[in-house]
């Protein structure tokens, strides 16, 4: 058996537990013998994760749910294989359920033709649909579900006391999850989600990538301000709400203004 290395009471992060980074952060939350897993990552890590869970003495029969923060391939490619091994229900937002069930490679980023990316994506059924305000019971504790769209339309976060399992919303360096229209990114929604996190009294953010960190309101303010600017930049294509240069150009054309 392995010695458990919880980061906080009732919380183990499996990269940290293993002492090596093998993919996205995988959180095991447990109490009174019951447990859930948040995200899994790629198929190649599933056997290692399953062995680790077994050697940490978490009975598979006590798993309440395999939770997907959202339906991006780097979080869920291994979900079907994990479900087969653990035999627990999958929980995700309704907007993630369809791309998971249909193995939608475009929506999940499993296929990006221009970059030569085409990853296998086995379909997986979602038995538990969860949404904002729902509670997930684990022994005597509960995860509170937050819908925090922006990176994707199905992005969920999960609150446990003063901890927030924050998905791809924000990382320790102030970066955010990829902004891309075809898989459901929305800058206005992203800003609202970040404001919700900032306004909350959570103390720790446990993201899906990179280190866990204390909530930093100054850093969040800078990130929110940056995304507010993104809304008015051509760089972000159809995710932008407007492009002020086009308004200026229209006025200059109407006025017959020459280049200076």
Where are these regions (language model features)?
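C-terminal regulatory/interaction regions
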Residues: 236-260
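Metallo-beta-lactamase
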Residues: 35, 42-44, 135, 142-222, ...
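Active-site HxH/HxHxD metal-binding segment of metal-dependent hydrolases
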Residues: 42-47, 54-135, 225, 229-232
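Short, structured coil segments at secondary-structure junctions
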Residues: 7, 85-86, 201
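Conserved beta-strand hairpin/beta-sheet module of binuclear metal-dependent hydrolase folds
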Residues: 2-56, 60, 157-167
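Short, charged, surface-exposed secondary-structure boundary motifs
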Residues: 23, 99-103, 174-175
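Divalent metal-coordination and catalytic microenvironments
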Residues: 10, 29, 39, 49, ...
């Amino acid at each position: 058996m392995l010695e458990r290395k919880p980061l906080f009471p009732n919380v183990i992060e499996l990269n940290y537990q293993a002492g090596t980074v093998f993919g996205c952060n995988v959180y095991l939350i447990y109490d009174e013998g019951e447990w859930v897993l948040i995200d899994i990552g790629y198929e190649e890590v599933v056997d290692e994760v399953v062995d680790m869970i077994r050697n940490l003495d978490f009975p598979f029969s006590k798993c309440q749910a395999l939770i997907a923060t959202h339906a991006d391939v780097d979080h869920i490619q291994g979900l079907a294989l994990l479900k087969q091994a653990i035999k627990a229900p999958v929980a995700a937002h309704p907007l993630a359920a369809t791309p998971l069930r249909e193995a939608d490679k475009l929506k999940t980023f499993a296929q990006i033709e221009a970059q030569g990316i085409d990853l296998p994506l086995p379909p997986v059924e979602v038995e538990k649909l969860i949404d904002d305000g729902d509670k997930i019971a684990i022994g005597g504790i509960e995860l509170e579900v937050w819908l925090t769209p922006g990176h994707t339309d199905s992005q969920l976060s999960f609150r446990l006391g003063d901890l927030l399992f924050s998905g791809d919303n924000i990382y320790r360096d102030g970066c955010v999850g990829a902004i891309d229209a075809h898989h459901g990114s929305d800058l206005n929604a992203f800003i609202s989600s970040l404001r919700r996190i900032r306004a909350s009294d959570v103390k720790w953010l446990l993201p899906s990538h990179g280190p866990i960190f204390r909530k930093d309101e100054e850093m969040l303010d800078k990130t929110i301000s940056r995304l507010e600017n993104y809304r008015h930049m051509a760089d972000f294509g159809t995710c932008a709400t407007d492009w002020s240069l086009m308004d200026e150009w229209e006025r200059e054309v109407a006025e017959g203004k020459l280049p200076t």
